[in-house]
C-alpha cells in the first residue's frame, strides 16, 4: 500500500520519502495477489468496491509498468471455487456472477482435484497479480525513477 501511494504522489510531482523498518515486511510481500471479489464471495458494498477495483487495476498496472520498465504479472485468468455439492455452489453469495461447473468440468479445470469436490464456480472476471516477484519490484523501480527517497531500517514510532 505504501509504495502504491508513494508512486501516485510522485507521479503528481510531490516529493516523497518512504520510511520503512524492513521493506520485506510490506503487505505486498505477504499478500496472495488474488484480484477476486467474486471468488471471495463478497457481498454488498465490499463486492461493489471489488468490482470497481477490477475495472481500474489494468490502467493502474500499466502506469507502474511504464514508469518502472518491467511487467507486474497481472493475469486476468479467472478463478475456480470448488464446492462439495451443487447446492452449496448455488447458495454461494456471488454464484450469479460465476459459470457453474459440474464434476467433469471441475476436473478439467483442476486436474487431480479430490473426490470430495463435486461442483464449482468459474469466475472468469477475477484474476491475480504476482505481488512478491513482480508488482513490488516494479513499484520500487517506478518510485525510484520518479525520485522517491527510501529510508530503510528506520522504525516509525509515532
Task: Please state what every model-predicted region is.
Residues 10-30:
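Glycine-rich FAD pyrophosphate-binding loop
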Residues 34-109:
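Dinucleotide-binding Rossmann-like beta1-alpha1 core, especially the glycine-rich loop
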Residues 75, 112-118:
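A short, glycine/Asx- and small/polar-enriched loop/turn
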Residues 19, 80-83, 124:
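Short hydrophobic segments within beta-strands
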Residues 6, 10, 142:
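Gly/Ala-rich phosphate-binding loop of Rossmann-like dinucleotide-binding domains
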Residues 2-3:
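N-terminal Rossmann-fold NAD(P) dinucleotide-binding loop
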Amino acid at each position: 500500500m505504501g509504495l502504491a501511494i508513494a508512486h501516485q504522489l510522485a507521479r503528481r510531482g510531490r516529493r516523497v520519502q518512504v520510511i520503512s523498518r524492513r521493506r520485506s515486511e510490506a503487505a505486498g510481500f505477504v499478500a496472495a495477489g488474488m484480484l477476486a471479489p467474486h471468488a471471495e464471495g463478497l457481498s454488498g458494498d465490499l463486492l461493489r468496491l471489488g468490482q470497481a477495483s477490477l475495472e481500474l487495476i489494468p490502467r493502474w498496472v500499466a502506469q507502474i509498468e511504464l514508469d518502472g520498465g518491467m511487467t507486474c504479472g497481472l493475469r486476468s485468468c479467472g478463478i475456480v471455487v470448488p464446492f462439495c455439492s451443487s447446492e452449496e455452489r448455488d447458495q454461494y453469495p456471488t454464484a450469479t456472477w460465476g459459470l457453474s461447473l459440474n464434476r467433469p468440468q471441475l476436473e478439467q479445470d483442476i486436474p487431480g482435484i479430490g473426490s470430495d469436490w463435486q461442483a464449482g464456480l468459474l469466475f472468469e472476471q477475477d484474476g491475480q497479480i504476482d505481488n512478491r516477484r513482480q508488482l513490488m519490484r516494479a513499484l520500487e523501480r517506478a518510485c525510484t525513477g520518479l525520485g522517491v527517497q527510501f529510508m530503510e531500517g528506520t522504525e516509525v514510532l509515532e
